[in-house]
Amino acid sequence: MLIIETLPMLRREVRRWRQDGKRVALVPTMGNLHDGHMTLVDEARERADIVIVSIFVNPMQFERADDLARYPRTLQEDCEKLNRRGVDLVFSPAPADIYPHGVDGQTFVDVPSLSTLLEGASRPGHFRGVSTIVSKLFNLVQPDLACFGEKDYQQLALIRKMVADMGYDIDIIGVPTVRAKDGLALSSRNGYLTAEERKIAPLLSKVMQQIAERLGQGERHVEEMMISAENTLAENGLRADGLAIVDADTLLPLNVDSQRAVILMAAWLGKARLIDNQQVDLTQ
């Protein structure tokens, strides 16, 4: 497995594989890899000849400097996991290589509406950072396909829209969320939880499942369901930071024509911001 830090070396290797007619997959990450990331890698391996994993803690995605500073960096352990998984290349650039003029001097990519809706409203600039770095990685690697987790539902929707709008010839593969046995969605930020908080955290997915069951039974009292969910979370020490039940295709409020809903949930538990989502078929 190659570990590359510079843009010219990355381009050289990608060019070589391209000349050999290889199909290339990209898995963008910020490192601190867990089993959810490995599922993305496995999906990429099934679909391509060459798997490239990027590890870059993107400063443009962080609103607070202290959050950026404490994000776990575990490059050596990550590379060992990826090597065992049969990854061909790890691209781990320094911020100065990605943003030579600094974040403030960087040309950015913005996806209208999806960047400021829902999760974007509570995290200004976050999705601009996502779309900018993903676009840059797409330009550098020029993959045939890229794999993203469905846990970050709005991010996946935003990337798909960006790819369509910008004319990228890249297949975007959404991979189902990987969960612990108690239902908690795997996340790098779960490491921020104390032992006691970890016992409480699965409540987020349980509340989400309760909403899904009510929607599946034909209930459409969205506001009442969200208030009830927020109260249940608060009673157990979770502070809601974005609860929504919206059309799964548009991320806009449900209407009579909506065929699928998605429940989007975000909540703080101690120092960890947990997110999760679940899609619901409304046609049955």
Swiss-Prot record:
Pathway: Cofactor biosynthesis; (R)-pantothenate biosynthesis; (R)-pantothenate from (R)-pantoate and beta-alanine: step 1/1
Main EC class the enzyme belongs to: ligase
Entry GO terms, CC: cytosol
Main location: cytoplasm
Positions bound to ATP: 30-37, 149-152, 178, 186-189
Record GO terms (molecular function): ATP binding; pantoate-beta-alanine ligase activity
Binding site for (R)-pantoate: Q61, Q155
Function description: Catalyzes the condensation of pantoate with beta-alanine in an ATP-dependent reaction via a pantoyl-adenylate intermediate.
Subunit structure: Homodimer.
HAMAP family from the UniProt entry: PanC
Official protein name in the record: Pantothenate synthetase
Gene: panC
